[in-house]
Amino acid sequence: MKHYKWAKIICLLIAIGLTKACDYDLSFSPAQTQDIRFSSDTVYLDTIFTSIGSSTYNLRIYNQADHNIKIGSIRLDQGSDSQFRLNVDGMHGQDFNDIEVLANDSIYVFIETTVDIKDYAANAPEFLYNDQLLVDEQTVELITLVKDAIFLYPKREDGFKEMIPLGTDEEGNAFGIEGFYLEDNELIFTNERPYVIYGYAGVPSEKTVRFEAGARIHFHDNSGLIAAESSSVHVLGEQSADAEMQEGEVIFEGDRLEPFFENIPGQWGAIWLTAGSTNHIFRHATIKNASVGILMDYNDETENPTLVLEQTQIHNSSAVGLWAKTGHVRAVNSIFGNAGNASFFGNIGGSYEFTHCTFANYWNRSFRSTPAVILNDYVPISETEDFVMPLEKAVFANCIIDGNQTVEFGVEQKGDQELSFSLDHTALRFSTADETIYENPYYDFSSSTLYPKLILNKQTAFHQPSTNDFRISQESEVIGLGKSTHAASVPVDLNGVDRTNLPDLGAFQHLIFEKED
């Protein structure tokens, strides 16, 4: 009986509480102009490509009053014709009425847009699209810049996307990668409009794709460029008069234009130079935010380099900047920057020649256990077997090999033939208390064959390495340490500055920067 009595009392208390709660009624007054404050009077949505949706941006509407208010209307000035989309306090639409906001509280308005530039400015390369968000009698400007672009993507037939064949598996089944081969009229990329590529754009056999000065190439996620057997890639950028505008540079990057994505690695796949492709030239090119900047499967077995890099920069690769498998590469005035693993991986041997190049890995997005530069002669093909090819040559002349690790140069041999490399008038970051590392004979820094002129553990004083600015300042300890005969073959630096008189190491002659307070 006692339990029954307590149950009756509890039920009675709950009933009284519910009755009082129902008596408590929230009241809302019509919002006055002075009650409302906005987090911004203008919402700038970052640049988008035509017909591609933007990221989501937010505006906060504050109730500054000590009482509850009801906003009569939140709507777009252009109404149903507007290309902006709204989400107000969790509700989608373009016109909202009687929105309640508690005293000293706020609500969010989320804003997106998709604009087809042809609906507003036919043949224009870009168009500034705007509308107004009307909040009762107050307004907030909505602005976005829309860029026209050329879109290239795989065809879809019967629900299947076009594929580029890569080979067959052990059972004889064909496999490939989502992509398409460029048509003859698509093999020249100009600077008239940016290009947006979905999937892998394939260069057909016996064809050459040409990227002219100022071309802008944007790859979607899991997309890239692939060169088939006997095909070539020619990137023919020019020295830019304006270092910020980079009007002569050919730039390969992702298709997200918002500032947040400017230095985000791994936004797209790779520039893939398959085995049998030949005569690749990259001049005044910037390759940024890929998984692998350039993936090179093999060399073309000729006396000439299969890949020539001149004034080329590879930045923010989530895996490797330049990954050359038995490659034949010649590079001058080039930068191999931040990467999740190696800036340059000379894998399964090959032949490499670098003059006035900067290898600098200041990766800070995750733990990195690999050095900036790796040379080896093998690849595992099973748990017990390696495929081996000799490292015929790897010359680093007037270069910098640096980073935020203590050891930025790795050499490993599995085959019988000794690896052939030399660091001549080259600065190297290599400092470790682990004496076992020096048991590797390739780290004998007294060897005049491997290290004819090694400059060890000097302060390079890069300007802003975390943001890919590898110019050296007046405080650098590698100023004037280059060999003049090496510099004579590359008489100007990456910015076109003469270096023949007193060459600094790396891709840049030093600059005098104003010290920040």
Annotate each predicted stretch with a short phrase.
Residues 18-21:
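C-terminal motif of bacterial Sec signal peptides marking the signal peptidase cleavage site
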Residues 24:
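Short, conserved catalytic or interaction motifs in soluble domains
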Residues 27-28, 36-47, 52-53, 96-106, ...:
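Beta-strand/loop edge motif enriched in small/polar residues
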Residues 55-57:
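Structural beta-strand segments of beta-rich domains
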Residues 61-68:
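Asparagine-centered strand-capping/turn motif at beta-strand->loop junctions
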Residues 77-95:
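Short, solvent-exposed loop/linker segments at beta-strand-coil boundaries, enriched for Pro/Gly
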Residues 1-10:
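Bacterial N-terminal signal peptides that target proteins for export
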